[in-house]
C-alpha cells in the first residue's frame, strides 16, 4: 500500500493502529474546525494525549500532510469499524463557524 504522492509534509502520529485490519473501501473527510496549516495539524496529532489522528490533512493553501501511513488505521472518526476501512482526511476551514467553509484550493485538492 502506498501513500499519496501529493504529500508535502510528514509528521507521523503515534495515535494509530498498525496495521489496519480491513482493506480500504472508503474515504472519510472531516473539517478541522479551524484554519490550521498541515504543520499545525500534525503537531496536534503527534501528541499521544490527543488520542486522534487522520491519514492526511489539507490546509487552506492546498498543502497535503501525512500523519498516518495508509497501511495503518488512523483514529479519526470515533469508529474503529470506519477507520479500518477508510482513508481519513482532515481539511482546514478558511472561515470559522457558520457553514465551516473550506477554501476552493483545499476542496479541489480533495
Q: Which residues fall in each region the model found?
A:
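Active-site-adjacent loop/helix surface patches within enzyme catalytic domains
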Residues: 2-109
Amino acid at each position: 500500500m502506498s501513500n499519496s504522492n501529493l504529500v508535502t509534509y510528514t509528521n507521523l502520529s503515534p495515535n494509530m493502529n498498525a496495521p489496519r485490519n480491513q482493506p480500504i473501501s472508503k474515504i472519510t473527510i472531516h473539517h478541522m474546525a479551524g484554519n490550521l496549516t498541515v504543520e499545525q495539524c500534525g503537531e496536534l496529532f503527534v501528541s499521544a494525549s490527543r488520542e486522534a489522528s487522520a491519514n492526511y490533512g489539507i490546509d487552506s493553501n492546498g498543502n497535503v500532510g501525512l500523519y498516518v501511513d495508509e497501511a495503518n488505521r488512523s483514529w479519526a472518526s470515533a469508529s474503529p469499524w470506519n477507520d479500518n476501512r477508510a482513508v481519513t482526511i482532515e481539511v482546514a476551514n478558511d472561515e470559522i463557524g457558520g457553514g465551516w467553509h473550506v477554501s476552493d484550493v483545499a476542496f479541489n485538492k480533495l
